[in-house]
Design a protein with these regions (language model features):
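Flexible inter-repeat linkers and adjacent short helices
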Residues: 1-36
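Helix-turn-helix repeat elements of alpha-solenoid scaffolds
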Residues: 1-4, 34-50, 71-87, 107-119, ...
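Solenoid-like repeat scaffolds
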Residues: 5-12, 50-58, 85-97, 122-132, ...
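Generic helix N-cap/helix-start motif at coil->alpha-helix transitions
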Residues: 13-18, 57-67, 93-104, 127-140, ...
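Residue-level signature for tetratricopeptide repeat
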Residues: 24, 28-31, 72, 104-108, ...
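Alpha-solenoid helical repeat scaffolds
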Residues: 27, 31-32, 75, 205-208, ...
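Short coil/linker segments at helix-helix boundaries
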Residues: 27-55, 235-244, 253
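Alpha-helical protein-protein interaction modules
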Residues: 133-143, 148-265, 269-270, 274-280
Length: 280
């Protein structure tokens, strides 16, 4: 940490580098030895993001800092700061306008005769929107966990999306998160069999995720034009956190109190063993 702080101070006007420092700190602040140290790192992230946004003229870097700063604020419990930062940019009019940018850009490429580029833009947009829907649906389950009707409707609809777009193979990480939350929802209503089904789906997704030594974003036989886009991201196709750190978090998945009611169930104990094998 002190080494990266020193580098941040040394290159205080190199905003692309500072943005990477912010991302690095955010993805690893949990490694700090105590809660106070973690809060200190999060505060440093907020301050450095603010510095970058104040002085950097590169709009892409500026925009990248907003979600990083928002996550740091949330971790610090500064919810009003998150609202102040994001509320205007997330109003329905602006969200609708953003969703049309890819459509307009693809049409422009198509009309100029660049079909290949139009194809790529639309694939990237569809992929991004599908993952956004999947992530939002997991959060939607979390806030409606006490409403079984809403939960079951959401699980049924997103289940069709997962099947149609082969999401356990395309993006097992986000799919695992949804399956995990679905299991928790069913446990909240004492529906153990349904919970076990989704817990099993969760473990299956993790098995796919950790097949290779490195976690990489990738396309498939439908999304054939998105991998060059991954290469343009700051971390390329690689995950922002190392596999070992992800495994540490995953190992504790079934320690969540909601799963206590399944302790001793043969099917659940089998899933726990599979999870343990994955994380060793």
């Amino acid at each position: 940490l002190e080494r990266t702080r020193s580098l941040a101070h040394q290159y205080y006007s190199c905003y692309p580098f500072l943005s990477q420092i912010c991302a690095l700190w955010l993805n690893h602040f949990t490694l700090a030895e105590d809660p106070e140290k973690r809060r200190e790192v999060l505060s440093d992230i907020c301050d450095l993001c603010e510095h970058i946004k104040k002085h950097c003229k590169n709009i892409s870097i500026y925009n990248d800092m907003t979600p990083i700063q928002s996550v740091a604020f949330l971790q610090l419990g500064r919810t009003q700061d998150v609202i102040d930062l994001l509320e205007d940019s997330c109003n329905p009019v602006k969200l609708s306008a953003d969703s049309h940018k890819s459509l307009l850009l693809s049409q422009a490429y198509l009309l100029s005769g660049n079909i290949e580029k139009a194809d790529s833009i639309l694939q990237i947009s569809m992929y991004d929107n599908i993952l956004s829907l999947l992530g939002n649906a997991a959060n939607y389950l979390a806030i409606h966990v006490n409403d079984l009707t809403v939960c079951e409707q959401t699980i049924a609809r997103i289940g069709k999306l997962i099947e149609a777009y082969h999401l356990p193979g395309l993006h097992p990480n986000n799919t695992a998160s949804f399956e995990y939350q679905a299991a928790i929802c069913y446990l909240a209503h004492n529906k153990k069999e349904e919970a076990l089904t989704h817990a099993a789906n969760f473990v299956t997704c993790l098995s796919t995720l950790f097949t290779d030594w490195q976690i990489l974003l990738h396309g498939d036989d439908y999304f054939t034009k998105i991998e060059p886009w991954f290469a343009m991201l700051d971390n390329g196709a690689a995950a922002p956190r190392s596999k070992s750190l992800v495994l540490q978090d995953i190992a504790k998945s079934f320690d969540y109190p909601a799963f206590t009611v399944l302790q001793g169930d043969p099917a659940f104990e089998k899933l726990k063993r599979k999870l343990k094998e994955l994380t060793q």
